[in-house]
Amino acid sequence: MFLLYEYDIFWAFLIISSAIPVLAFLISGVLSPIRKGPEKLSSYESGIEPIGDAWLQFRIRYYMFALVFVVFDVETVFLYPWAMSFDVLGVSAFIEVFIFVLILILGLVYAWRKGALEWS
């Protein structure tokens, strides 16, 4: 039996949430004035006339810190819902999260030993 009618609210939400941004872009594209000129083609830096080249090279250390930050930021995103429903999930979920955190700690120790977290 085809039970698509049970998901009517989901499909309505999906269609409306997809249509709103598309309509916003279309309306702004139709109603906005189009003025081309040298001011539109220049870069904007907080109201200050840009000086020098906009491209600079960052040291690889910044990327290593950013990667470690992203890993532990994602860990927080995964741990928060678990912590909110800890009393419902039971011991098996606790063991799974413990293994998850243990793997992340091993990754942190590995990065630390490789010197990825030292600023030199």
Curated annotation (Swiss-Prot):
Major location (coarse): plastid
SS bonds (residue pairs): none
Source species of the chain: Arabis hirsuta (Hairy rock-cress)
GO BP annotations listed: photosynthesis, light reaction
Stored HAMAP family: NDH1_NuoA (MF_01394)
Record PANTHER family: NADH-UBIQUINONE OXIDOREDUCTASE CHAIN 3
UniProt membrane topology term: Multi-pass membrane protein
GO cellular component: chloroplast thylakoid membrane; NADH dehydrogenase complex
EC number: 7.1.1.-
Transmembrane segments: 9-29, 64-84, 88-108
Family: Belongs to the complex I subunit 3 family.
Enzyme class: translocase
Gene3D superfamilies: NADH:ubiquinone/plastoquinone oxidoreductase, chain 3
Pfam family for this entry, one: Oxidored_q4
Its biological purpose: NDH shuttles electrons from NAD(P)H:plastoquinone, via FMN and iron-sulfur (Fe-S) centers, to quinones in the photosynthetic chain and possibly in a chloroplast respiratory chain. The immediate electron acceptor for the enzyme in this species is believed to be plastoquinone. Couples the redox reaction to proton translocation, and thus conserves the redox energy in a proton gradient.
Enzymatic reactions: a plastoquinone + NADH + (n+1) H(+)(in) = a plastoquinol + NAD(+) + n H(+)(out); a plastoquinone + NADPH + (n+1) H(+)(in) = a plastoquinol + NADP(+) + n H(+)(out)
GO molecular function: NADH dehydrogenase (ubiquinone) activity; quinone binding
Protein name: NAD(P)H-quinone oxidoreductase subunit 3, chloroplastic
Keywords on record: Chloroplast, Membrane, NAD, NADP, Plastid, Plastoquinone, Quinone, Thylakoid, Translocase, Transmembrane, Transmembrane helix, Transport
